[in-house]
From Swiss-Prot:
PROSITE patterns: HSP70_1, HSP70_2, HSP70_3. One of its GO terms (biological process) is iron-sulfur cluster assembly. The keyword Nucleotide-binding applies. The keyword Chaperone applies. It comes from the Bacteria. This is Chaperone protein HscA homolog. Chaperone involved in the maturation of iron-sulfur cluster-containing proteins. Has a low intrinsic ATPase activity which is markedly stimulated by HscB. Gene3D superfamilies: 1.20.1270.10, 3.30.420.40, Actin, Chain A, domain 4, Substrate Binding Domain Of DNAk, Chain A, domain 1. One of its GO terms (molecular function) is ATP-dependent protein folding chaperone. CDD domains: ASKHA_NBD_HSP70_HscA. Keywords: ATP-binding, Chaperone, Nucleotide-binding. Pfam families: HSP70. Belongs to the heat shock protein 70 family.
Length: 621
Protein backbone atom coordinates (compact mmCIF):
# COMPACT_ATOMS: atom_id res chain seq x y z
CA UNK A 1 0.00 0.00 0.00
CA UNK A 2 1.43 3.36 -1.03
CA UNK A 3 1.66 6.03 1.69
CA UNK A 4 0.92 9.65 0.88
CA UNK A 5 3.54 12.26 1.77
CA UNK A 6 2.00 15.06 3.84
CA UNK A 7 3.90 18.33 4.26
CA UNK A 8 3.21 21.49 6.25
CA UNK A 9 1.28 24.29 4.49
CA UNK A 10 3.73 26.50 2.65
CA UNK A 11 6.29 23.72 2.36
CA UNK A 12 6.93 21.42 -0.56
CA UNK A 13 7.97 17.77 -0.47
CA UNK A 14 11.63 17.25 -1.28
CA UNK A 15 12.41 16.60 -4.97
CA UNK A 16 12.88 12.88 -4.39
CA UNK A 17 9.44 12.79 -2.76
CA UNK A 18 7.73 14.53 -5.64
CA UNK A 19 4.47 12.79 -6.52
CA UNK A 20 4.28 11.96 -10.21
CA UNK A 21 1.03 12.81 -11.95
CA UNK A 22 0.22 13.26 -15.62
CA UNK A 23 -2.37 14.84 -17.86
CA UNK A 24 -3.81 12.70 -20.64
CA UNK A 25 -5.64 13.90 -23.72
CA UNK A 26 -7.56 10.83 -24.87
CA UNK A 27 -8.36 12.02 -28.37
CA UNK A 28 -10.41 10.69 -31.25
CA UNK A 29 -7.46 10.65 -33.66
CA UNK A 30 -4.39 11.01 -31.43
CA UNK A 31 -3.72 10.77 -27.71
CA UNK A 32 -0.98 12.39 -25.62
CA UNK A 33 0.45 12.28 -22.12
CA UNK A 34 2.10 15.29 -20.45
CA UNK A 35 3.69 16.07 -17.10
CA UNK A 36 5.13 19.03 -15.22
CA UNK A 37 8.91 18.60 -14.93
CA UNK A 38 11.01 21.24 -13.18
CA UNK A 39 7.93 23.50 -13.12
CA UNK A 40 7.54 23.27 -16.92
CA UNK A 41 4.65 21.32 -18.44
CA UNK A 42 5.72 19.21 -21.40
CA UNK A 43 4.37 16.41 -23.55
CA UNK A 44 6.21 13.11 -23.06
CA UNK A 45 7.37 11.55 -26.36
CA UNK A 46 7.84 7.87 -27.13
CA UNK A 47 11.27 6.26 -27.52
CA UNK A 48 11.46 7.62 -31.08
CA UNK A 49 10.72 11.19 -30.02
CA UNK A 50 7.11 11.23 -31.28
CA UNK A 51 4.74 13.14 -28.96
CA UNK A 52 1.50 11.80 -30.49
CA UNK A 53 0.11 8.31 -30.08
CA UNK A 54 -2.44 7.50 -32.80
CA UNK A 55 -5.66 6.38 -31.09
CA UNK A 56 -5.61 3.12 -33.04
CA UNK A 57 -5.68 -0.46 -31.70
CA UNK A 58 -5.27 -3.59 -33.86
CA UNK A 59 -6.24 -6.90 -32.28
CA UNK A 60 -4.26 -10.01 -33.23
CA UNK A 61 -5.38 -13.67 -33.54
CA UNK A 62 -2.93 -14.52 -30.75
CA UNK A 63 -4.91 -12.34 -28.35
CA UNK A 64 -2.39 -9.51 -28.23
CA UNK A 65 -2.70 -6.04 -29.73
CA UNK A 66 -0.69 -3.42 -31.56
CA UNK A 67 -1.27 0.17 -30.43
CA UNK A 68 -0.46 3.48 -32.08
CA UNK A 69 1.68 3.89 -35.19
CA UNK A 70 2.13 0.16 -35.78
CA UNK A 71 -1.63 -0.42 -35.66
CA UNK A 72 -2.22 2.59 -37.91
CA UNK A 73 0.16 1.17 -40.53
CA UNK A 74 -1.75 -2.14 -40.51
CA UNK A 75 -5.21 -0.57 -40.85
CA UNK A 76 -5.24 -0.82 -44.66
CA UNK A 77 -4.78 -4.61 -44.76
CA UNK A 78 -6.81 -5.46 -41.64
CA UNK A 79 -9.59 -2.85 -41.29
CA UNK A 80 -12.07 -5.03 -39.35
CA UNK A 81 -9.67 -5.70 -36.47
CA UNK A 82 -8.09 -2.24 -36.42
CA UNK A 83 -10.21 0.03 -34.24
CA UNK A 84 -9.94 3.72 -35.12
CA UNK A 85 -11.75 6.69 -33.48
CA UNK A 86 -13.03 4.53 -30.61
CA UNK A 87 -13.86 7.69 -28.67
CA UNK A 88 -16.97 8.04 -30.82
CA UNK A 89 -18.32 4.79 -29.36
CA UNK A 90 -17.65 5.49 -25.66
CA UNK A 91 -20.82 5.18 -23.58
CA UNK A 92 -22.94 4.78 -26.72
CA UNK A 93 -25.43 2.16 -27.87
CA UNK A 94 -25.71 0.99 -31.47
CA UNK A 95 -28.49 3.47 -32.28
CA UNK A 96 -26.36 6.36 -30.96
CA UNK A 97 -23.38 5.80 -33.30
CA UNK A 98 -23.41 8.24 -36.21
CA UNK A 99 -22.59 7.03 -39.75
CA UNK A 100 -22.22 3.44 -38.55
CA UNK A 101 -22.68 2.20 -42.12
CA UNK A 102 -19.38 3.85 -43.12
CA UNK A 103 -17.32 1.84 -40.64
CA UNK A 104 -15.74 -1.54 -41.47
CA UNK A 105 -16.49 -3.06 -38.05
CA UNK A 106 -18.83 -5.85 -36.98
CA UNK A 107 -20.86 -4.44 -34.09
CA UNK A 108 -22.66 -6.22 -31.28
CA UNK A 109 -25.50 -4.23 -29.71
CA UNK A 110 -24.81 -5.12 -26.09
CA UNK A 111 -26.76 -3.60 -23.16
CA UNK A 112 -25.44 -0.19 -22.21
CA UNK A 113 -22.69 0.13 -24.79
CA UNK A 114 -21.94 -1.08 -28.29
CA UNK A 115 -19.28 -3.84 -28.64
CA UNK A 116 -16.96 -4.72 -31.52
CA UNK A 117 -16.17 -8.20 -32.89
CA UNK A 118 -12.46 -8.86 -33.43
CA UNK A 119 -10.27 -11.91 -33.98
CA UNK A 120 -9.35 -11.62 -30.31
CA UNK A 121 -13.00 -11.74 -29.24
CA UNK A 122 -15.70 -9.16 -28.60
CA UNK A 123 -14.23 -5.90 -27.29
CA UNK A 124 -15.95 -2.93 -25.68
CA UNK A 125 -14.90 0.68 -26.37
CA UNK A 126 -13.78 0.77 -22.73
CA UNK A 127 -11.34 -2.09 -23.34
CA UNK A 128 -10.03 -0.49 -26.55
CA UNK A 129 -9.53 2.86 -24.81
CA UNK A 130 -7.81 1.08 -21.91
CA UNK A 131 -5.17 -0.25 -24.35
CA UNK A 132 -4.38 3.33 -25.41
CA UNK A 133 -4.33 4.62 -21.83
CA UNK A 134 -2.12 1.74 -20.65
CA UNK A 135 0.39 2.54 -23.42
CA UNK A 136 0.48 6.19 -22.34
CA UNK A 137 0.83 5.20 -18.67
CA UNK A 138 3.79 2.95 -19.51
CA UNK A 139 5.38 5.73 -21.59
CA UNK A 140 5.05 8.15 -18.67
CA UNK A 141 6.44 5.75 -16.07
CA UNK A 142 9.38 4.84 -18.32
CA UNK A 143 10.15 8.53 -18.95
CA UNK A 144 9.64 9.75 -15.38
CA UNK A 145 11.27 6.70 -13.79
CA UNK A 146 8.60 5.87 -11.22
CA UNK A 147 4.98 4.88 -10.78
CA UNK A 148 2.24 7.46 -11.21
CA UNK A 149 -0.01 8.54 -8.36
CA UNK A 150 -2.72 9.50 -10.80
CA UNK A 151 -3.82 11.26 -13.95
CA UNK A 152 -6.15 14.02 -15.06
CA UNK A 153 -7.93 12.85 -18.21
CA UNK A 154 -9.68 15.29 -20.51
CA UNK A 155 -13.12 14.80 -22.03
CA UNK A 156 -15.24 16.92 -24.39
CA UNK A 157 -17.48 19.41 -22.60
CA UNK A 158 -20.54 17.75 -24.12
CA UNK A 159 -19.72 14.25 -22.75
CA UNK A 160 -22.63 12.94 -20.69
CA UNK A 161 -22.47 10.82 -17.52
CA UNK A 162 -22.31 7.54 -19.46
CA UNK A 163 -19.39 8.74 -21.59
CA UNK A 164 -17.55 10.15 -18.58
CA UNK A 165 -18.04 6.97 -16.58
CA UNK A 166 -16.83 4.90 -19.55
CA UNK A 167 -13.67 7.04 -19.62
CA UNK A 168 -13.11 6.46 -15.90
CA UNK A 169 -13.67 2.72 -16.32
CA UNK A 170 -11.11 2.61 -19.15
CA UNK A 171 -8.56 4.38 -16.95
CA UNK A 172 -9.18 1.95 -14.10
CA UNK A 173 -8.72 -0.98 -16.48
CA UNK A 174 -5.43 0.59 -17.60
CA UNK A 175 -4.21 0.80 -14.00
CA UNK A 176 -4.61 4.56 -13.72
CA UNK A 177 -5.94 6.45 -10.72
CA UNK A 178 -8.16 9.23 -12.09
CA UNK A 179 -7.50 12.40 -10.12
CA UNK A 180 -10.13 14.18 -12.14
CA UNK A 181 -11.90 14.35 -15.48
CA UNK A 182 -11.33 17.80 -16.94
CA UNK A 183 -13.32 19.40 -19.74
CA UNK A 184 -11.14 19.96 -22.81
CA UNK A 185 -11.92 23.69 -23.25
CA UNK A 186 -11.09 24.31 -19.58
CA UNK A 187 -7.80 22.43 -20.00
CA UNK A 188 -6.93 24.59 -23.01
CA UNK A 189 -7.71 27.74 -21.03
CA UNK A 190 -5.51 26.56 -18.15
CA UNK A 191 -2.64 25.84 -20.57
CA UNK A 192 -2.79 29.44 -21.80
CA UNK A 193 -2.73 30.67 -18.21
CA UNK A 194 -6.24 32.07 -18.47
CA UNK A 195 -7.01 30.88 -14.92
CA UNK A 196 -4.38 33.20 -13.44
CA UNK A 197 -6.21 36.47 -13.05
CA UNK A 198 -7.55 36.67 -16.59
CA UNK A 199 -11.02 38.11 -16.95
CA UNK A 200 -13.38 38.35 -19.89
CA UNK A 201 -15.04 36.23 -22.54
CA UNK A 202 -12.96 33.59 -24.34
CA UNK A 203 -13.85 31.20 -27.14
CA UNK A 204 -12.26 27.76 -27.49
CA UNK A 205 -12.45 26.49 -31.09
CA UNK A 206 -11.63 22.77 -31.08
CA UNK A 207 -11.44 20.97 -34.43
CA UNK A 208 -10.20 17.44 -33.89
CA UNK A 209 -10.02 14.45 -36.15
CA UNK A 210 -13.62 13.39 -35.73
CA UNK A 211 -15.44 16.09 -33.81
CA UNK A 212 -15.83 19.86 -33.70
CA UNK A 213 -16.54 21.73 -30.47
CA UNK A 214 -16.94 25.40 -29.68
CA UNK A 215 -17.10 26.64 -26.09
CA UNK A 216 -17.67 30.18 -24.88
CA UNK A 217 -16.08 30.71 -21.46
CA UNK A 218 -16.51 33.57 -19.04
CA UNK A 219 -13.56 34.06 -16.68
CA UNK A 220 -13.97 36.27 -13.61
CA UNK A 221 -11.31 35.89 -10.92
CA UNK A 222 -11.17 32.14 -10.66
CA UNK A 223 -14.63 31.36 -11.93
CA UNK A 224 -14.72 29.26 -15.10
CA UNK A 225 -18.26 29.58 -16.42
CA UNK A 226 -19.12 27.69 -19.59
CA UNK A 227 -21.62 30.15 -21.04
CA UNK A 228 -22.49 27.98 -24.02
CA UNK A 229 -21.25 25.04 -26.04
CA UNK A 230 -21.90 23.81 -29.53
CA UNK A 231 -20.36 21.90 -32.35
CA UNK A 232 -20.80 18.88 -34.55
CA UNK A 233 -19.97 15.40 -33.29
CA UNK A 234 -19.60 14.16 -36.88
CA UNK A 235 -17.34 16.89 -38.30
CA UNK A 236 -13.57 16.91 -38.06
CA UNK A 237 -10.28 16.72 -39.89
CA UNK A 238 -11.30 13.32 -41.30
CA UNK A 239 -13.98 15.05 -43.39
CA UNK A 240 -11.32 17.25 -45.01
CA UNK A 241 -9.41 14.07 -45.91
CA UNK A 242 -12.59 12.64 -47.41
CA UNK A 243 -12.98 15.68 -49.69
CA UNK A 244 -9.47 15.11 -51.02
CA UNK A 245 -10.22 11.41 -51.65
CA UNK A 246 -13.38 12.31 -53.60
CA UNK A 247 -11.35 14.79 -55.66
CA UNK A 248 -8.68 12.15 -56.37
CA UNK A 249 -11.30 9.60 -57.47
CA UNK A 250 -12.90 12.16 -59.78
CA UNK A 251 -9.64 13.51 -61.23
CA UNK A 252 -8.13 10.05 -61.81
CA UNK A 253 -11.40 8.49 -63.03
CA UNK A 254 -11.12 5.61 -60.57
CA UNK A 255 -13.58 2.75 -60.21
CA UNK A 256 -15.38 2.11 -56.87
CA UNK A 257 -12.70 1.55 -54.24
CA UNK A 258 -12.12 -1.48 -52.02
CA UNK A 259 -11.79 -0.99 -48.25
CA UNK A 260 -8.00 -1.35 -48.56
CA UNK A 261 -7.71 1.24 -51.36
CA UNK A 262 -10.02 3.63 -49.52
CA UNK A 263 -7.78 3.41 -46.45
CA UNK A 264 -4.69 3.92 -48.63
CA UNK A 265 -6.10 7.07 -50.27
CA UNK A 266 -7.28 8.40 -46.91
CA UNK A 267 -3.72 8.09 -45.60
CA UNK A 268 -2.41 9.89 -48.70
CA UNK A 269 -5.08 12.58 -48.30
CA UNK A 270 -4.16 13.15 -44.66
CA UNK A 271 -0.50 13.55 -45.58
CA UNK A 272 -1.42 16.01 -48.35
CA UNK A 273 -3.62 18.04 -46.00
CA UNK A 274 -0.81 18.28 -43.44
CA UNK A 275 1.73 19.24 -46.12
CA UNK A 276 -0.52 22.06 -47.36
CA UNK A 277 -0.43 23.65 -43.91
CA UNK A 278 3.04 24.96 -44.77
CA UNK A 279 3.28 24.61 -48.59
CA UNK A 280 1.42 25.95 -51.64
CA UNK A 281 1.10 22.55 -53.33
CA UNK A 282 1.76 18.84 -52.86
CA UNK A 283 1.90 15.67 -54.97
CA UNK A 284 -0.35 12.66 -54.39
CA UNK A 285 1.09 9.37 -55.66
CA UNK A 286 -0.52 5.96 -55.08
CA UNK A 287 -0.58 2.43 -56.51
CA UNK A 288 -3.98 0.76 -56.00
CA UNK A 289 -4.69 -2.95 -55.60
CA UNK A 290 -6.34 -2.90 -59.06
CA UNK A 291 -3.06 -1.86 -60.66
CA UNK A 292 -4.30 1.68 -61.26
CA UNK A 293 -1.87 4.47 -60.47
CA UNK A 294 -2.53 7.95 -59.18
CA UNK A 295 -0.29 10.97 -59.77
CA UNK A 296 -1.88 14.34 -59.05
CA UNK A 297 -0.84 17.78 -57.84
CA UNK A 298 -3.10 19.41 -55.26
CA UNK A 299 -2.68 23.14 -54.67
CA UNK A 300 -3.62 25.03 -51.52
CA UNK A 301 -6.08 27.07 -53.59
CA UNK A 302 -7.87 23.95 -54.87
CA UNK A 303 -7.92 22.47 -51.36
CA UNK A 304 -9.52 25.66 -50.05
CA UNK A 305 -12.23 25.44 -52.73
CA UNK A 306 -12.88 21.75 -51.99
CA UNK A 307 -13.34 22.35 -48.27
CA UNK A 308 -14.95 25.81 -48.16
CA UNK A 309 -18.33 24.36 -47.17
CA UNK A 310 -16.73 22.37 -44.33
CA UNK A 311 -15.08 25.51 -42.98
CA UNK A 312 -18.42 27.33 -43.06
CA UNK A 313 -20.02 24.33 -41.37
CA UNK A 314 -17.79 24.97 -38.34
CA UNK A 315 -18.63 28.68 -38.23
CA UNK A 316 -22.39 28.17 -37.96
CA UNK A 317 -22.14 26.51 -34.50
CA UNK A 318 -19.73 29.29 -33.46
CA UNK A 319 -22.31 31.98 -34.27
CA UNK A 320 -25.01 29.95 -32.56
CA UNK A 321 -22.88 29.49 -29.42
CA UNK A 322 -22.24 33.23 -29.28
CA UNK A 323 -25.98 33.91 -29.58
CA UNK A 324 -26.74 31.35 -26.87
CA UNK A 325 -24.20 33.05 -24.59
CA UNK A 326 -25.72 36.44 -25.31
CA UNK A 327 -22.42 37.91 -26.54
CA UNK A 328 -21.06 39.25 -29.82
CA UNK A 329 -17.70 38.67 -31.50
CA UNK A 330 -16.65 42.11 -30.23
CA UNK A 331 -17.11 40.88 -26.65
CA UNK A 332 -14.64 38.00 -27.12
CA UNK A 333 -11.25 38.84 -25.62
CA UNK A 334 -9.38 35.88 -27.09
CA UNK A 335 -9.84 32.77 -29.22
CA UNK A 336 -7.96 29.56 -28.36
CA UNK A 337 -7.39 27.03 -31.15
CA UNK A 338 -7.34 23.36 -30.17
CA UNK A 339 -6.90 20.25 -32.30
CA UNK A 340 -4.45 19.38 -35.06
CA UNK A 341 -6.94 20.35 -37.78
CA UNK A 342 -6.69 24.00 -36.69
CA UNK A 343 -3.21 24.05 -38.22
CA UNK A 344 -4.86 24.42 -41.63
CA UNK A 345 -4.39 28.04 -42.83
CA UNK A 346 -7.97 28.06 -44.16
CA UNK A 347 -9.25 27.44 -40.63
CA UNK A 348 -7.05 30.07 -39.02
CA UNK A 349 -8.03 32.66 -41.63
CA UNK A 350 -11.74 31.94 -41.26
CA UNK A 351 -11.66 32.06 -37.45
CA UNK A 352 -9.57 35.24 -37.51
CA UNK A 353 -11.97 36.93 -39.92
CA UNK A 354 -15.04 35.93 -37.90
CA UNK A 355 -13.69 37.23 -34.58
CA UNK A 356 -11.72 40.13 -36.02
CA UNK A 357 -8.54 39.09 -34.21
CA UNK A 358 -5.61 36.72 -34.55
CA UNK A 359 -6.35 33.46 -32.68
CA UNK A 360 -4.01 32.28 -29.91
CA UNK A 361 -1.68 29.78 -31.57
CA UNK A 362 1.60 30.04 -29.65
CA UNK A 363 0.95 26.60 -28.10
CA UNK A 364 0.84 23.48 -30.26
CA UNK A 365 -2.90 22.87 -30.92
CA UNK A 366 -2.30 19.11 -30.71
CA UNK A 367 -0.69 19.47 -27.29
CA UNK A 368 -2.52 22.35 -25.57
CA UNK A 369 -5.20 20.18 -23.93
CA UNK A 370 -2.68 17.65 -22.57
CA UNK A 371 -0.52 20.48 -21.22
CA UNK A 372 -3.46 22.02 -19.36
CA UNK A 373 -4.36 18.61 -17.95
CA UNK A 374 -0.76 18.11 -16.78
CA UNK A 375 -0.80 21.45 -14.96
CA UNK A 376 -4.02 20.47 -13.22
CA UNK A 377 -2.66 17.01 -12.36
CA UNK A 378 0.47 18.53 -10.86
CA UNK A 379 -1.67 20.74 -8.65
CA UNK A 380 -3.93 17.88 -7.54
CA UNK A 381 -0.90 15.74 -6.72
CA UNK A 382 0.21 18.41 -4.24
CA UNK A 383 3.42 19.42 -6.00
CA UNK A 384 4.60 22.98 -5.70
CA UNK A 385 7.74 24.62 -7.00
CA UNK A 386 9.46 27.48 -5.10
CA UNK A 387 7.62 30.72 -5.75
CA UNK A 388 4.36 29.06 -6.71
CA UNK A 389 1.45 30.05 -4.51
CA UNK A 390 -0.92 27.13 -4.85
CA UNK A 391 -3.90 27.00 -2.53
CA UNK A 392 -4.15 23.41 -1.27
CA UNK A 393 -7.52 22.56 0.22
CA UNK A 394 -8.34 19.53 2.30
CA UNK A 395 -11.59 20.81 3.78
CA UNK A 396 -14.17 23.41 2.80
CA UNK A 397 -13.15 26.52 4.78
CA UNK A 398 -16.57 28.17 4.48
CA UNK A 399 -20.05 26.80 3.88
CA UNK A 400 -21.39 26.75 0.34
CA UNK A 401 -25.05 27.44 -0.25
CA UNK A 402 -27.75 28.73 -2.54
CA UNK A 403 -30.10 31.71 -2.22
CA UNK A 404 -33.76 30.84 -1.72
CA UNK A 405 -36.93 32.98 -1.69
CA UNK A 406 -36.76 35.92 0.67
CA UNK A 407 -32.99 36.30 0.34
CA UNK A 408 -32.29 33.33 2.61
CA UNK A 409 -29.31 30.99 2.34
CA UNK A 410 -29.81 27.24 2.19
CA UNK A 411 -26.45 25.63 3.03
CA UNK A 412 -25.68 22.72 0.70
CA UNK A 413 -22.14 21.86 1.86
CA UNK A 414 -21.28 22.93 5.44
CA UNK A 415 -17.85 24.29 6.32
CA UNK A 416 -15.14 21.81 7.32
CA UNK A 417 -16.57 19.13 5.03
CA UNK A 418 -13.66 17.07 3.74
CA UNK A 419 -13.11 17.15 0.00
CA UNK A 420 -13.82 15.81 -2.53
CA UNK A 421 -17.48 16.08 -1.56
CA UNK A 422 -20.84 16.19 -3.30
CA UNK A 423 -24.25 17.13 -1.93
CA UNK A 424 -27.63 17.50 -3.63
CA UNK A 425 -30.90 19.06 -2.57
CA UNK A 426 -34.28 19.46 -4.25
CA UNK A 427 -36.06 22.78 -4.66
CA UNK A 428 -39.32 23.74 -6.32
CA UNK A 429 -41.02 26.67 -8.04
CA UNK A 430 -42.70 29.56 -6.22
CA UNK A 431 -45.27 30.59 -8.85
CA UNK A 432 -47.66 28.79 -11.17
CA UNK A 433 -46.28 28.40 -14.69
CA UNK A 434 -42.72 29.30 -13.64
CA UNK A 435 -40.36 28.22 -16.46
CA UNK A 436 -37.00 29.47 -15.18
CA UNK A 437 -35.08 29.55 -11.92
CA UNK A 438 -32.12 31.75 -10.97
CA UNK A 439 -29.39 29.89 -9.07
CA UNK A 440 -27.26 32.15 -6.86
CA UNK A 441 -24.21 30.37 -5.45
CA UNK A 442 -23.02 31.73 -2.09
CA UNK A 443 -20.17 31.22 0.37
CA UNK A 444 -20.26 32.04 4.07
CA UNK A 445 -21.83 31.31 7.44
CA UNK A 446 -24.54 33.98 7.56
CA UNK A 447 -28.24 33.26 7.18
CA UNK A 448 -29.04 35.96 4.61
CA UNK A 449 -27.68 36.09 1.06
CA UNK A 450 -26.83 39.79 1.38
CA UNK A 451 -24.35 38.95 4.17
CA UNK A 452 -22.59 36.14 2.29
CA UNK A 453 -20.03 36.18 -0.52
CA UNK A 454 -21.53 35.82 -3.98
CA UNK A 455 -19.60 33.28 -6.07
CA UNK A 456 -21.67 32.92 -9.21
CA UNK A 457 -25.12 33.17 -10.74
CA UNK A 458 -26.70 31.16 -13.53
CA UNK A 459 -30.18 30.32 -14.76
CA UNK A 460 -32.02 27.08 -15.38
CA UNK A 461 -34.45 27.63 -18.24
CA UNK A 462 -36.94 25.34 -19.92
CA UNK A 463 -38.76 24.17 -16.77
CA UNK A 464 -42.15 22.77 -17.89
CA UNK A 465 -45.00 25.06 -16.77
CA UNK A 466 -46.64 23.53 -13.68
CA UNK A 467 -48.51 24.68 -10.61
CA UNK A 468 -46.30 26.19 -7.91
CA UNK A 469 -44.50 23.51 -5.92
CA UNK A 470 -44.95 20.74 -8.49
CA UNK A 471 -41.63 21.05 -10.32
CA UNK A 472 -38.60 19.30 -8.81
CA UNK A 473 -35.25 20.99 -9.38
CA UNK A 474 -32.28 19.00 -8.08
CA UNK A 475 -29.34 21.27 -7.28
CA UNK A 476 -26.01 19.45 -6.91
CA UNK A 477 -22.83 20.94 -5.43
CA UNK A 478 -19.60 19.03 -6.05
CA UNK A 479 -16.14 20.10 -4.88
CA UNK A 480 -13.10 18.39 -6.39
CA UNK A 481 -9.77 17.80 -4.69
CA UNK A 482 -8.44 21.11 -6.01
CA UNK A 483 -11.31 23.09 -4.51
CA UNK A 484 -13.14 23.48 -7.81
CA UNK A 485 -16.86 23.75 -7.17
CA UNK A 486 -19.24 22.57 -9.86
CA UNK A 487 -22.89 23.47 -9.40
CA UNK A 488 -25.57 21.92 -11.56
CA UNK A 489 -29.34 22.31 -11.55
CA UNK A 490 -31.57 19.72 -13.19
CA UNK A 491 -35.35 19.66 -13.59
CA UNK A 492 -36.24 16.02 -13.02
CA UNK A 493 -39.22 15.78 -15.41
CA UNK A 494 -37.84 17.40 -18.57
CA UNK A 495 -34.16 16.73 -17.85
CA UNK A 496 -33.13 20.33 -18.66
CA UNK A 497 -29.85 21.16 -16.96
CA UNK A 498 -27.49 24.08 -16.40
CA UNK A 499 -24.15 24.25 -14.61
CA UNK A 500 -21.20 26.44 -13.63
CA UNK A 501 -17.68 25.84 -12.27
CA UNK A 502 -16.29 28.01 -9.45
CA UNK A 503 -13.12 28.18 -7.39
CA UNK A 504 -14.71 28.84 -3.98
CA UNK A 505 -11.59 30.08 -2.20
CA UNK A 506 -10.19 32.25 -4.99
CA UNK A 507 -8.85 35.47 -3.56
CA UNK A 508 -9.52 34.49 0.08
CA UNK A 509 -6.57 34.25 2.41
CA UNK A 510 -6.55 32.74 5.90
CA UNK A 511 -7.39 36.15 7.42
CA UNK A 512 -10.44 36.56 5.17
CA UNK A 513 -11.73 33.11 6.09
CA UNK A 514 -11.18 33.79 9.80
CA UNK A 515 -12.98 37.14 9.54
CA UNK A 516 -15.98 35.60 7.79
CA UNK A 517 -16.20 32.85 10.40
CA UNK A 518 -15.95 35.35 13.27
CA UNK A 519 -18.72 37.48 11.77
CA UNK A 520 -20.84 34.36 11.46
CA UNK A 521 -20.36 33.46 15.14
CA UNK A 522 -20.99 36.99 16.42
CA UNK A 523 -24.11 37.47 14.31
CA UNK A 524 -25.60 34.00 14.82
CA UNK A 525 -28.45 35.05 17.15
CA UNK A 526 -29.40 38.11 15.13
CA UNK A 527 -29.10 36.13 11.89
CA UNK A 528 -31.47 33.45 13.14
CA UNK A 529 -34.04 36.10 14.07
CA UNK A 530 -33.74 37.71 10.63
CA UNK A 531 -33.95 34.30 8.98
CA UNK A 532 -37.14 33.44 10.88
CA UNK A 533 -38.62 36.79 9.82
CA UNK A 534 -37.69 36.20 6.16
CA UNK A 535 -39.06 32.64 6.23
CA UNK A 536 -42.43 33.77 7.62
CA UNK A 537 -42.62 36.57 5.03
CA UNK A 538 -41.96 34.04 2.25
CA UNK A 539 -44.68 31.78 3.66
CA UNK A 540 -47.05 34.75 3.74
CA UNK A 541 -46.24 35.68 0.14
CA UNK A 542 -46.78 32.09 -0.97
CA UNK A 543 -50.20 31.96 0.73
CA UNK A 544 -51.26 35.34 -0.71
CA UNK A 545 -50.15 34.31 -4.22
CA UNK A 546 -52.08 31.02 -4.07
CA UNK A 547 -55.17 32.67 -2.56
CA UNK A 548 -55.17 35.42 -5.20
CA UNK A 549 -55.31 32.82 -7.99
CA UNK A 550 -57.97 30.78 -6.16
CA UNK A 551 -60.23 33.80 -5.68
CA UNK A 552 -59.84 34.78 -9.32
CA UNK A 553 -60.86 31.28 -10.44
CA UNK A 554 -63.55 30.34 -7.89
CA UNK A 555 -64.50 33.49 -5.99
CA UNK A 556 -68.14 32.89 -6.93
CA UNK A 557 -68.23 30.08 -4.35
CA UNK A 558 -68.16 32.68 -1.56
CA UNK A 559 -71.00 34.79 -0.25
CA UNK A 560 -70.37 38.57 -0.01
CA UNK A 561 -69.96 38.24 3.76
CA UNK A 562 -67.45 35.37 3.43
CA UNK A 563 -65.46 37.27 0.80
CA UNK A 564 -65.36 40.37 3.00
CA UNK A 565 -64.05 38.31 5.94
CA UNK A 566 -61.29 36.80 3.83
CA UNK A 567 -60.35 40.21 2.39
CA UNK A 568 -60.06 41.55 5.95
CA UNK A 569 -57.69 38.73 6.93
CA UNK A 570 -55.66 39.29 3.73
CA UNK A 571 -55.26 42.97 4.59
CA UNK A 572 -54.28 42.08 8.15
CA UNK A 573 -51.59 39.69 6.91
CA UNK A 574 -50.18 42.26 4.47
CA UNK A 575 -49.95 44.84 7.27
CA UNK A 576 -48.35 42.38 9.71
CA UNK A 577 -45.77 41.30 7.08
CA UNK A 578 -44.45 44.88 6.98
CA UNK A 579 -43.48 44.59 10.65
CA UNK A 580 -40.49 42.87 12.27
CA UNK A 581 -42.29 40.35 14.49
CA UNK A 582 -41.98 36.91 12.88
CA UNK A 583 -44.32 35.35 15.45
CA UNK A 584 -47.06 37.87 14.61
CA UNK A 585 -46.63 37.09 10.91
CA UNK A 586 -46.91 33.36 11.62
CA UNK A 587 -50.11 33.95 13.60
CA UNK A 588 -51.56 36.03 10.75
CA UNK A 589 -50.63 33.32 8.20
CA UNK A 590 -52.28 30.65 10.36
CA UNK A 591 -55.41 32.79 10.80
CA UNK A 592 -55.80 33.35 7.06
CA UNK A 593 -55.09 29.68 6.33
CA UNK A 594 -57.76 28.53 8.80
CA UNK A 595 -60.16 31.21 7.60
CA UNK A 596 -60.05 29.83 4.06
CA UNK A 597 -60.40 26.11 4.92
CA UNK A 598 -64.10 26.07 3.96
CA UNK A 599 -63.33 27.87 0.68
CA UNK A 600 -60.65 25.26 -0.10
CA UNK A 601 -63.12 22.43 0.58
CA UNK A 602 -65.69 23.94 -1.79
CA UNK A 603 -63.07 24.30 -4.52
CA UNK A 604 -62.14 20.64 -4.10
CA UNK A 605 -65.81 19.60 -4.38
CA UNK A 606 -66.16 21.62 -7.58
CA UNK A 607 -63.02 20.04 -9.00
CA UNK A 608 -64.28 16.53 -8.24
CA UNK A 609 -67.68 17.24 -9.81
CA UNK A 610 -65.98 18.53 -12.98
CA UNK A 611 -63.78 15.45 -13.16
CA UNK A 612 -66.76 13.08 -12.79
CA UNK A 613 -69.11 14.96 -15.10
CA UNK A 614 -70.57 12.65 -17.80
CA UNK A 615 -69.03 9.49 -16.29
CA UNK A 616 -71.08 6.33 -15.59
CA UNK A 617 -70.63 4.41 -12.35
CA UNK A 618 -69.35 1.37 -14.28
CA UNK A 619 -66.52 3.52 -15.68
CA UNK A 620 -65.40 4.42 -12.19
CA UNK A 621 -65.14 0.82 -10.97
Amino acid sequence: MALLQISEPGESPAPHQRRLAVGIDLGTTNSLVASVRSSVPEVLPDDQGRPLLPSVVRYLPTGGAHIGYKAQAEAVRDPKNTIISVKRFMGRGLKDVAHIENTPYDFVDAPGMVQLKTVAGVKSPVEVSAEILATLRQRAEDTLGDELVGAVITVPAYFDDAQRQATKDAAKLAGLNVLRLLNEPTAAAIAYGLDNGSEGIYAVYDLGGGTFDISVLKLTKGVFEVMSTGGDSALGGDDFDQRIVCWVVEQAGLQPLSAEDTRLLLNKARAAKEWLSTADSTEIDAMLSTGETVHLVLTAETFAELTATLVQKTLSPVRRALRDAGVTVEDVKGVVLVGGATRMPIIRRAVGQLFGQTPLTNLDPDQVVAIGAAMQANLLAGNRAPGEDWLLLDVIPLSLGVETMGGLVEKIIPRNSTIPVARAQEFTTFKDGQTAMAIHVLQGERELASDCRSLARFELRGIPPMVAGAARIRVTYQVDADGLLSVSARETVSGVEASIAVKPSYGLGDDDVARMLQEGFQSAEDDMRRRALAEERVEGERLLEALSQALAADGDLLSPEERAAIDTEIAALRTTMQGEDHRAIKDAVDALSHGTDEFAARRMDRGIRKALAGKRIEELG
